[in-house]
Amino acid sequence: YDSINKIGGGSAKVDLTDAAIDLPMFNWAKIPGENGEVDASFNFKSSSVHKIEIDEAIIGTLQGRGVFEFASDLSISDATVTDFKSPGYDIDKLVININDDKTIEVLAEGGLIDTTFLRRTKGVTENREISFDFTSARLQLAKDITLQGKLIGNINKLGSGTAILNGTLLLEQSPLIEEATIEASFNEYFETLSGTGLIGGVEANLSYESLSNATSQLLVRSQNAGRTLIGLDILDTIRGGELILRNVYRNNNFDNFETEIKVTDFSVVEAPKSIRALSVLSLTGLYSLIEGDGTKFDVGVANIETIGDRRILKNVKASGEAVKFELAGEYDRETDELQVRGLLAPLSLISDIIGVIPLVSNIITGQDKKGLLATQFEMSGKLADPVITINPTSVLAPGVIRNILSPDWLTRESGIRIDSHK
């Protein structure tokens, strides 16, 4: 101790086993009885602690090293923490600067950083402005939403904030969009994301917003539907096309949601087994649909409901110059069981027949019977090797071309689910 300049220092080993500690900034607490050991040195000036250096600290589930500097009122003014580990955190380096106006600057780098504390209006963020700069292989943004990359932003005194995300955004640990630049806004109750990046190696636009009652919405747009659907692990048989995909989530677990998909001007390069099976009926032109560049479609629409592992295909339909089909049913990812029923019509063949059949106008007006040349099909069993059933009587049965071509032609023919057969 220098009595003239009133400065000095020392070291200490502290046993905190019986202590209770709460760090709301990291949503962490230690209860009495948990392990607590700290090796530290300290400097003081004018009878007040000026700096504490922690050589090693193991306190409950927290461990790390750090240097803490104090203001004249003994509040922390600056802190540098290294090798910090705690539930939700694996930080190589954390730097915190607290300015005279109580605004906070936070810089962190490491393998795992839980950023959800930034959205809590209690504790460290209450009535403070915060700016942050995080870089990590795993930035936890919300439940089941993480970012690999960099997050820079700020929060005002009311708890509302904005941020820029650069990197790969993941949903449930699966990449959603890569090499992305996304703008975000958030507070304690909601968040919105909007930006561009790569899905399946092609550029896509993504937007996300939380809605009322714990619901949220995800919208994806792309000029290359095929690559985007592959990147989202939805479908791998489509090539080209323009995509609009919308998910409306019913809860915060993202396991109960409605999906709407619309694809225009695309090809199916490997026809479903139901279409391939129709070739045995020797219908003119059908076999060519599964060869070469695939089947061309002008538009395809899918409405799918997800409840846990169940995928309920409410209506999946597509139409082009050569063929039109609609199907509905259900798939269970846990059991791999599939139950689908639908209709398929080779429109090029219908067009040829219309040209040679008398009284075409009467046929087109139709009746409530099975459509002319509309083939019913059903798939059931395991998705990897489904059992396919064809109703050949519908191929030659008299019926209604108008019904085949109408938007709701599947309503009377399909709409089954797995549990309807139990």
Question: What are the residue ranges of the model-derived segments?
Answer:
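N-terminal accessory/assembly segment that mediates macromolecular interactions
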Residues: D73-S77
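Surface-exposed, gly/pro-biased binding rims or lids
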Residues: S348-I388
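Solvent-exposed beta-strand/coil patches in large extracellular/periplasmic or lumenal scaffold regions
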Residues: Y1-E69, T115-A345, F377-V395, V400-K422
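N-terminal accessory interaction module
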Residues: A79-V81, S86-Y89
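Flexible beta-edge/linker motif
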Residues: K93-G111, S160
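Polar/charged alpha-helical tracts
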Residues: T82, D92-K93, T116, N156
